[in-house]
Structures are given as structure tokens and as C-alpha cells.
Amino acid sequence: MSMGAVRGFRTDEIDEEEMMKARAAYFACGDYLDEIIGDFLALLKRDGLLDDTIVVYTTDHGELAGEHGLFWKNTWHEAACRIPLIFSLPEQRRGELTATEITAPVSLADVFPTLCGLTQT
């Protein structure tokens, strides 16, 4: 059975209440992630490690939460394949380096070489 045949993949296969519950759970996960990242950064700061830490935030895929009439990640729609890739450097946080936004597509395969370049290893 293809993933498209699984009940709940398309929004016309679930009722409005189920869709609202699914969206609420999805957004609650984002809120929780924001909270624990904040807690983690606070611990790094408390322990004097934040000034020597490169923080990288990314994910392996996006998610559809009803956009295009679909749920899950199994499409090439932008919401499923365009993901955050954020590097937070000590120099940026100290105001010594201006943050730059790169809008061109990148790959997660770029993360390791980028970290090696930043740490000169």
C-alpha cells in the first residue's frame, strides 16, 4: 500500500476535529522544542560554555499540516522539503560578526564541512 493510500494522509480523509487536533499537536511540538532549546542555551550560558559554542539548528525534513490538502512529509511541496539550517556563532552573539541569510538551496551534507571550516579542523 502506498503512503498516499494511508488514511489521514489527505485532509479530505479526516474530519475537521481530527485535523485541528493534528495541527494543535504539531504546533505544540514546535513550542516545546523552542522551550527546550532555550533551556539548553541557558545551561550553556550558566556553565560559561556559550561563548565557545557554535549552535546549529536544522532538521531532516519539513512537514505538511494540511497545506495542499495533505499531512506528513511525503511530498516535494516546499513545506516538506524546505527546512531551517541555522548556525549561531559566538562572534555573532557578541556583535563582532553580522549574520547572513543564504537563500540558495543547501544540503545537510554541507553541515560537517562548514563546521570544520568554522573550527579550522
Describe these PLM feature segments.
Residues 10-53:
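A long, amphipathic alpha-helix that forms part
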Residues 42-97, 107:
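Histidine-centered active-site microenvironments of extracellular/periplasmic hydrolases
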Residues 1-3, 37, 55:
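Conserved hydrophobic/aromatic pocket- or pore-lining residues that grip, position, or stack substrates
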Residues 36-43, 64, 114, 118:
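Short alpha-helical functional segments enriched in proximate histidine and acidic residues
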Residues 23-33, 75-83, 94-119:
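A short beta-strand-to-alpha-helix junction
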Residues 1-14, 84:
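Core domains of carbohydrate- and sulfate-ester-processing enzymes
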